[in-house]
Amino acid sequence: MNIIEATVAAPDARVAIAIARFNNFINDSLLEGAIDALKRIGQVKDENITVVWVPGAYELPLAAQALAKTAKYDAVIALGTVIRGGTAHFEYVAGGASNGLAHVAQHSEIPVAFGVLTTESIEQAIERAGTKAGNKGAEAALTALEMINVLKAIQA
């Protein structure tokens, strides 16, 4: 039996982070967590990290697709926050971002990590951006790095 597993260390990885500007008071913490994880745990060099700002979470799939198509990156990390309000807008934005990023991940040759918070409240978002529920930006970064190494192992 063959078992393929991988580590998160990827010192030569080239990683793009697509991040939404909307709700940036939360997304800034996701970005800090992602960059810290890439550098400190993944040992990714600063010059191999590219950050691309987009207006909101709904625009993340298009940015991720464009980044993947350049063939400059080994992975794309999508970061954003969608907080439920009093209208159906949440479902459209959260669903569009989630489905769109899944589509890009399935049709590109590189990992696309999902670091988009979809929460019921601002408090839940803050908890998931670095307080008591960890930092989902850091988790997405580690997922991207592990998947880079998993795909390399599969192709070896």
UniProtKB/Swiss-Prot annotation:
Which EC numbers does the record give? 2.5.1.78
PANTHER family documented for this protein: 6,7-DIMETHYL-8-RIBITYLLUMAZINE SYNTHASE, 6,7-DIMETHYL-8-RIBITYLLUMAZINE SYNTHASE DMRL SYNTHASE LUMAZINE SYNTHASE
An example Gene Ontology CC term for this record: riboflavin synthase complex
Q: What class of enzyme is it?
A: transferase
| Similarity section | Belongs to the DMRL synthase family.
Listed InterPro entries: LS (IPR034964), LS/RS (IPR002180), LS/RS_sf (IPR036467)
| Subunit details | Forms an icosahedral capsid composed of 60 subunits, arranged as a dodecamer of pentamers.
Q: What are the protein's UniProt keywords?
A: Riboflavin biosynthesis, Transferase
* Pathway it works in: Cofactor biosynthesis; riboflavin biosynthesis; riboflavin from 2-hydroxy-3-oxobutyl phosphate and 5-amino-6-(D-ribitylamino)uracil: step 1/2
Where is (2S)-2-hydroxy-3-oxobutyl phosphate annotated to bind? G86, T87, R128
One BP annotation, GO: riboflavin biosynthetic process
User: A GO molecular-function term, please?
Assistant: 6,7-dimethyl-8-ribityllumazine synthase activity
Positions annotated as active site in the UniProt record = H89 (proton donor)
State the organism named in the record: Cronobacter sakazakii (strain ATCC BAA-894) (Enterobacter sakazakii)
Task: Name it.
Answer: 6,7-dimethyl-8-ribityllumazine synthase
Q: Which reaction does it catalyse?
A: (2S)-2-hydroxy-3-oxobutyl phosphate + 5-amino-6-(D-ribitylamino)uracil = 6,7-dimethyl-8-(1-D-ribityl)lumazine + phosphate + 2 H2O + H(+)
> Can you tell me which residues bind 5-amino-6-(D-ribitylamino)uracil?
F22, A57, Y58, E59, T81, V82, I83, F114
UniProt-listed Pfam families: DMRL_synthase (PF00885)
Output the superkingdom of the source species.
Bacteria
What is known about what this protein does?
Answer: Catalyzes the formation of 6,7-dimethyl-8-ribityllumazine by condensation of 5-amino-6-(D-ribitylamino)uracil with 3,4-dihydroxy-2-butanone 4-phosphate. This is the penultimate step in the biosynthesis of riboflavin.
The gene it comes from is ribH
